[in-house]
Amino acid sequence: MEKTFVMVKPDGVQRQLIGEILLRFERKGLQLIGAKLMKVSEETAGEHYKEHNGKPFFGELVDFITSGPVFAMVWEGEDAIAVARQLIGKTNPKEALPGTIRGDFGMFVGKNIIHGSDSPESAAREINLFFKEDELVEDEKLMNQWIY
């Protein structure tokens, strides 16, 4: 099964959207195998957004992600990355379809509620950045036989 990293950003946490987001992912059939409410250090934020280092908006990304608590998660399932990206919607909430998390709750690109890995490589890197191996609980659920 594929794993993906998803993070409710500070705006989503402050707007109390964690429960709604968890519900959408669970109803879709993904399995939560790791989760924690945490503050992101500047060092971790810089590593998380390293592909944007040197771009004009890099500082804003780091400032925003360190401005308050985030809810970091690891989800597992068939095509988990693509499924999560579909649930999340386009980066710019104004372009995100209704029914997606960003389409329903996002206001503008700078505060777009949620982050999701965009490839197996970024998922592995982000999971390793935010979680220790012993923080992930992989358990074969009986429901998997009804989904996959």
UniProtKB/Swiss-Prot annotation:
Q: Please indicate if the UniProt record lists Transmembrane helix as a keyword.
A: no
**What is any one GO biological process for this UniProt entry?**
GTP biosynthetic process
Kindly list the residue ranges recorded as spanning the membrane.
none
EC identifiers of the protein: 2.7.4.6
Listed cofactors: Mg(2+)
Which residues are annotated as modified residue Phosphoserine in the UniProt record?
Answer: S122
Which GO-annotated molecular functions does the record name?
ATP binding; metal ion binding; nucleoside diphosphate kinase activity
> In the record, which positions carry Phosphothreonine?
T91
User: Active-site residues?
Assistant: H115 (pros-phosphohistidine intermediate)
Matching entries from Pfam families are given as:
NDK
Which positions bind ATP? K9, F57, R85, T91, R102, N112
Family, according to the entry, reads as follows: Belongs to the NDK family.
Protein name, entry field: Nucleoside diphosphate kinase
Species of provenance:
Bacillus licheniformis (strain ATCC 14580 / DSM 13 / JCM 2505 / CCUG 7422 / NBRC 12200 / NCIMB 9375 / NCTC 10341 / NRRL NRS-1264 / Gibson 46)
Q: What is the lineage of its organism?
A: Bacteria, Bacillati, Bacillota, Bacilli, Bacillales
